Amino acid sequence: WTPETWVNELIALRKHLNLTKVHLLGQSWGGMLALDYILHYSPTGIESLILSSTLSSASLWASEQHRMIRFMSEVDQRAIEIAERTGNYESEDYIIANTNFMHAHCAGVYEIGKAPDCLTRPKKTGKEAYLYGWGPNEYTPTGSLAGFEVTDELKHIDIPTLIISGTNDLCTPLVAKTMHDNIKHSTWKLFPNCRHMVFAEATNQYIQLLQSWLKQNESVSR
């Protein structure tokens, strides 16, 4: 679970599907993958780039998460501080605190009958790739992506770029604006009252934005 492996998987997928021209959308970690791919592998055929609730700096991301933690209850703040200091992320107090944090900035519990079946049906999940790649939670990057810092390289991106984020997102307005300020001629759309999955909380507006963006940036040759 390293950036090189994931980029090579993307390269292999494009080759296998013969995707000579694409609009590349990266959501969350996928945006980091897209940035790594574009900045370090010189791909061709990228019509436009869509960076959805993502980041260009792991250190800024962690700093912003800790800033938001300071708005939580003292009990939750204390539980998170103890977990980070001791490395014990299994205590009941920490699990409750982290759940509260994720509900505030990522996603809540989906109710059966009020959400698509794909979100509510039982599923097997694993943590190994997330733990190895990022860390124990969103605000403690310790994995293979902990050193992801490409903000200073964003000036080299010369393709149309759309940045999407929510006001209550893990991708805070500062994280999103940092990318917007460093990618020339980029467009930034900030969705009010949305967390880390804007596409799920403002679905119609998100789809309309993408449709407009794709139409605007579709190559004439097609």
Language-model segment annotations:
Residues R70-I159:
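Alpha/beta-hydrolase
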Residues H185-R222:
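Catalytic active-site module of serine/aspartate enzymes centered on a nucleophile-bearing elbow/loop
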Residues K15-K21, P43, D158-I159, H185:
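Active-site acidic short loop of glycosyltransferases
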Residues E4-V22:
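Conserved acidic catalytic loop of the alpha/beta-hydrolase fold
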Residues T151-C194:
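Conserved loop-alpha-helix segment in the C-terminal half of the alpha/beta-hydrolase fold
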Residues T2-L10, T172, F199:
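Conserved donor sugar-nucleotide recognition element shared by glycan-biosynthetic enzymes
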Residues T20-E64:
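Conserved hydrolase catalytic core segment
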